[in-house]
Regions:
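Glycine-rich, aromatic-bearing surface loops/beta-hairpins
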Residues: 92-152
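A short linear-motif detector with a strong N-terminal bias
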Residues: 9-14, 22, 55-58, 77-80
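Histidine (H) residue identity feature
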Residues: 24, 36-37, 60, 68-70, ...
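Terminal interaction module
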Residues: 66-111
Length: 152
């Protein structure tokens, strides 16, 4: 599988899991999916009492250490529920979003190696009362790597 295909697969897995979680609750604890060179996927989460923001920060730090300790790490996605930044909100004005922080080891030679991918959503209830999530067009913001050490 080529690097782009791996990244898309990880994005799809992360988004699918977040969508399922949000169909059953108003929010969820952040989680990470990690793809290794041998194609194994590891899921991590870090729960800090009832504090979702603190859980995110703790998980972020755990991922930095994890990538350092596991050189076979290929791709990291860190997923959380958040509000979209005003600068990228689309015309519909929807700000509720799933944010996927994507980093790939193969991109570390580039100046901007990481992306936040915001996927806005609307919670919709069907005629029979079943909640579903309607996902809208994603928006991406690029920034320097946080998890992988910079390659030169």
């Amino acid at each position: 599988m080529i690097d782009d295909d791996k990244a898309i697969m990880m994005l799809e897995k992360a988004l699918e899991e977040a969508q399922k979680l949000l169909e059953h609750t108003d929010d969820f604890y952040p989680f990470a999916l990690i793809l290794h060179h041998d194609s194994t996927i590891k899921r991590l989460e870090q729960k800090c009492d009832d504090d979702i923001e603190e859980s995110y920060l703790m998980l972020h730090d755990v991922l930095i250490d994890y990538v350092h300790d596991h050189p076979t790490t290929d791709i990291v996605v860190l997923v959380t529920q958040t509000t979209m930044p005003k600068v990228i909100v689309q015309e519909d004005g929807i700000r509720s979003s799933i944010r996927i922080h994507l980093e790939e080891q193969s991109q570390q030679t580039k100046a901007i190696a990481s992306r936040y991918i915001y996927v806005p959503y609307q919670r919709v209830t069907s005629d029979i009362g079943t909640p579903t999530l309607h996902l809208l067009n994603p928006q991406a913001i690029s920034f320097p790597s946080e998890f992988f050490p910079k390659k030169r």
